[in-house]
Amino acid sequence: MRIFFDTCILYPRILRNIFLDIASQNFFFPFWSDHIINEWKYVYERKHKDKISELNIEILLLNARWPNSHISINKDHLDKIFLPDINDRHVLSGAISCNANILLTENLKDFPVGTLNRLGISPRSPESLLLQLYSENPELIKRSILNTFDKENKIFGQNFDIKNVFKSYNLKRLTNLIL
C-alpha cells in the first residue's frame, strides 16, 4: 500500500508516530509533500511559537528516516481537481503524484469518495485504517501502538493515557481493542 498523509496525520505527534511505526514494519509506505510539511509548521507554530526550532529538527529527522516519502507534487493536477474546498486540491494532487492507494485524513468530507475512487484512491480515516490493519494482524498493530506510547512516555517523562489520547484522535473503537 502507498498512503499519502494529510497534515492532520503528521500533526499530532503520537498519531504520526503510530502510523510510522506500523509503516516501518512494511505494512505500507507513507508519503507527504512540501505543502503538507508547510501546513504542519503553520499549525504547530500557532500553538507552540516558542518551540518551532524543535519542530524543524523533528522534520529533518522525519525526512532523514523516510527520504523517499517527502515528494514534490505535480502541479499539473491542480487545475483538473475539483473538491468541495479548493484549498485541499494540493492534498489530492500529492496522493496522485505518488500513486497512492489511500489518502489518509481526518477530513473525509473534503474528499468525496466518488472523486477519489475514479482516481484509484481510497479516502480513509485514521481509525478505519488502523481497524483494518488490526483485523489483519492484531498483535503486531497492538505492539506498535503500545511501543509508540512507551517511547513518547520516555521522551516526555510522563504517562500519556491511551484512552484519552485515542478519544482526542477519534479512535474510540480502536481503544476497546487495544486496552
PLM feature spans:
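Conserved beta-strand segments of alpha/beta enzyme cores
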Residues: F29, H70, G120-S122
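Active-site neighborhoods of divalent-metal-dependent phosphate/nucleic-acid chemistry enzymes
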Residues: P67-I102, E136-P138, E152, F156, ...
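Acidic, metal-binding active-site segment of PIN/NYN-like and related structure-specific nucleases
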Residues: D88-S122
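Metal-dependent nucleic-acid phosphoesterase active-site entry motif
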Residues: M1-N17
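PIN-domain endoribonuclease scaffold, especially VapC-family toxins
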Residues: D34-N74, T148-F166, N170-R173
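PIN/NYN-family metal-dependent endoribonuclease catalytic core
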Residues: R13-K47
